[in-house]
Amino acid sequence: MEYEFRRNSLTGTYLASFSMDHEVLGQWFSEELGPELAKIQQVLDIIKEIQAGKRDSWRLIGGDLTLDLDEEQARIYANALGFEQEYELEESMSLYDAESEAYCGLEDLEEALLSWYEFVQKGR
């Protein structure tokens, strides 16, 4: 999983971009976490608790995206994916979930979060 972090010097916004099949992680980092060090640290602390066996799983529901953690992996997905459709769409009209959902290993997420934390901290 590859990623790149940038900061817009004019607006001060932080942006994360992740490799194909993990694009939604970039959106989650940029929009749900943003430059909030306390929120980043909270997720890192929860990961440590899961790795230590103190928790089995954890969920953080954001404005547009949700993070689910368990002992093996992280899943980030658009909140809209959690809703059941009342009717079936034709095959050609099916919703494209690949950019709305991603899975990665817990350690991979932890590594990316640590890098994001450092990047945001240096930008202050």
UniProtKB/Swiss-Prot annotation:
Protein family: Belongs to the UPF0231 family.
Pfam family, one: UPF0231
Name by which UniProt lists this protein: UPF0231 protein Shewana3_0655
